[in-house]
């Protein structure tokens, strides 16, 4: 049976993650309060940030930037947007 949580990002009951997606306290916090659906949304956002900002994931500063963006995306005012990105129009 799926583990249900109240998702901090979506504000509704949803299926929780199967395991902490990151090490440390942030990973534990994400595991306890982020749904699979919200995590998939973050992975798309993260990919855009990596590509648009040409982040080198071997660089500790790039990894630190993404950790801060992860926390802002789920628990803060929202992560940075990729420059020039326009979300698709909703029909």
Curated annotation (Swiss-Prot):
This is Probable Fe(2+)-trafficking protein. Could be a mediator in iron transactions between iron acquisition and iron-requiring processes, such as synthesis and/or repair of Fe-S clusters in biosynthetic enzymes. GO terms for cellular component: cytosol. It comes from the Bacteria. GO terms for biological process: cellular response to oxidative stress. InterPro entries: Fe_traffick_prot_YggX, Fe_traffick_prot_YggX_sf. Coiled coil: none annotated. Keywords: Iron. Belongs to the Fe(2+)-trafficking protein family. It holds the Pfam family Iron_traffic. PANTHER family: FE(2+)-TRAFFICKING PROTEIN-RELATED. It comes from Burkholderia thailandensis (strain ATCC 700388 / DSM 13276 / CCUG 48851 / CIP 106301 / E264). One of its GO terms (molecular function) is iron ion binding. NCBIfam families: PRK05408.1.
